[in-house]
Amino acid sequence: MDDWENNDFIQRLDFSSCGEEGEDRSINEEDTLSSSPIKHCDFQKWNSPLPATPHRKLSEIFLSRTKSWVSPTLKSSPGVSRTHGNAETPLHITWKKLQLCDTPHTPKSLLSKTAFPSPGAKVPPKGFRHLRFTPGADLDDSTQASLVNINPFTPESYRQMLFLPNGKRKAREIKLVHLAQSFCEKAEVQRKDSAVRPADRCPLKDSNMVSRYQKEFLELERIGVGEFGSVYKCIKRLDGCVYAIKRSKRPLAGSSDEQLALREVYAHAVLGHHPHVVRYYSAWAEDDHMIIQNEHCNGGSLQDVLLENAKRGQYFPEAKLKEILLQVSMGLKYIHNSGLVHLDIKPSNIFICHKLVVEGQAGQEESDSDDEFSSGVMYKIGDLGHVTSIANPQVEEGDRRFLANEILQEQYFHLPKADIFALALTIALAAGAGPLPHNGAMWHHIRKGNIPSIPQKLPNGFIELLKLMIHPDPMERPSATALTKHPILRPSLGKAVQLQKQLNVEKCKTAMLERELKAARLAQTLMKDQPLGNANLQESETSPKKNNKRLVGGKNCRSFSFTVG
């Protein structure tokens, strides 16, 4: 143990630095690990949370690993407590005294110095340096595919593109083919099932890690409460931006609400980013609770504004109602064109964002903006927990107050028109209509195409549009695309179409005038050249005719002919 006494400075083996260093190197290192299971097992035992190895054996294992790392010329560090005396001192105590075990207070420069040996030291093989603790590293392809959720809203053609090999390595191509087969087989089984079985998807369970929510976010206040859970206004510590963090009330793993939570994540991931849909950033699970990181809308929900208006006896004016209807229709158009349907449109699921314009740049912001909304307010669709596919619907009924009758009758042939129905009732509430009934005679009266009583005077054209949106026959209701082009909501668009028609007529007139002018100029040119042509004609008539015959040989005439064409 003399070497141990003289070299009591133990250089830390930085296994956390085994980052990805390139595709080819990672593949070679994984092959090295799979071909040397003894080293891999020793390393896992040394870091295992199971009861510790006896001290003498542990010291022997450690010395065998670090003998080639420690330089005999290294001096003891003053910051490390020296260990004298009994050689049976547990190694893990000395290890902890180094204070370099990935503590958040250790400078990165110090970690980098202790993570590499001295220039004269012997470098260990790369395979040992890049050992990983991945428990599923030895799983076969089918097992790995079973641990991946299948997004039911992803188009099949796009899902197949995910596993197209790039042709760089045959081993990678073969692995991708096996994964694609397992993945597609699982997707087909899930598509045929009416409900996804808990055993067929990745459960909502954490991995005993430090709370990501507490580590990455600073909670400011609770801004909303719903059936699913609570929404908190938080600042992300890394970028300093404000986000809305949605956390489920109850543990969802294995419960009936788990599918709703996953459906919202699936829909957000597929829809991507649209100015009239609340933006999605991330989602994860902690203690079996689903946590979703979304865009924070600084104006709250439309329901919050309606409650404030009710207290003050106010309601949205006509121009504002048209703007809300138009913007939400744009969001629905994007959702419907993506092959999905929302099925829970109501004031509490429409969120408001006030644009923040820097002073002195208002004119530039207006000129660079692509939209035509001058109020600086954006209305966005959120809460995608009831979203389902139009082609393969798995319908969960939303709020009965906004539910179309065909959904209650389980007639899912025109699902997008159910969103149009709910949007019309949402606009009626914003216009000042009273609370909607959950059932009863008034509920059926509305389903017959009757708009609830609105206290303010609105144009007949706008009222007729709302009535058309709640027509008993869903085929008679306008689509979201038609609403975005409706002349009542976008009169400027109709005016632009009219001006375009007038422009086309004027272009035709201009083209005709140009042709007439060209013909007139051509005729004038011919008139100028006509006297010269007549003089040449008269001269040819008065002049004697020339003999055009050709004499060949003995002054004999030779005739010739030619073909025109």
Curated annotation (Swiss-Prot):
Q: What positions does UniProt annotate as the active site of this protein?
A: 344 (proton acceptor)
Ranges of residues in domain Protein kinase? 217-493
* Residues the record lists as binding Mg(2+): 349, 383
Q: Which UniProt keywords apply?
A: ATP-binding, Coiled coil, Kinase, Magnesium, Meiosis, Metal-binding, Nucleotide-binding, Nucleus, Transferase, Tyrosine-protein kinase
Kindly list the GO molecular function terms attached to this UniProt entry: ATP binding; magnesium ion binding; non-membrane spanning protein tyrosine kinase activity; protein tyrosine kinase activity
Set out the biological process GO terms recorded for this chain's protein.
meiotic cell cycle; mitotic cell cycle; regulation of meiosis I
- What EC number(s) are associated with this protein in UniProt? 2.7.10.2
**Domain of life (superkingdom):** Eukaryota
Q: Where is this region: Disordered?
A: 531-553
Where ATP binds, per the record, is at 223-231, 246
What the entry lists under SMART domains is as follows:
S_TKc
- Cellular component per GO? cytoplasm; nucleus
Record localization: Nucleus
Q: Which InterPro entries match?
A: CC_SR_Kinase, Kinase-like_dom_sf, Prot_kinase_dom, Protein_kinase_ATP_BS, Ser/Thr_kinase_AS, Wee1-like_protein_kinase
Coiled coil, from the record? 496-522
This enzyme catalyses: L-tyrosyl-[protein] + ATP = O-phospho-L-tyrosyl-[protein] + ADP + H(+)
The role this protein plays is: Oocyte-specific protein tyrosine kinase that phosphorylates and inhibits CDK1 and acts as a key regulator of meiosis. Required to maintain meiotic arrest in oocytes by phosphorylating CDK1 at 'Tyr-15', leading to inhibit CDK1 activity and prevent meiotic reentry.
Protein family: Belongs to the protein kinase superfamily. Ser/Thr protein kinase family. WEE1 subfamily.
* Descriptive protein name: Wee1-like protein kinase 2
What species does this protein belong to? Gallus gallus
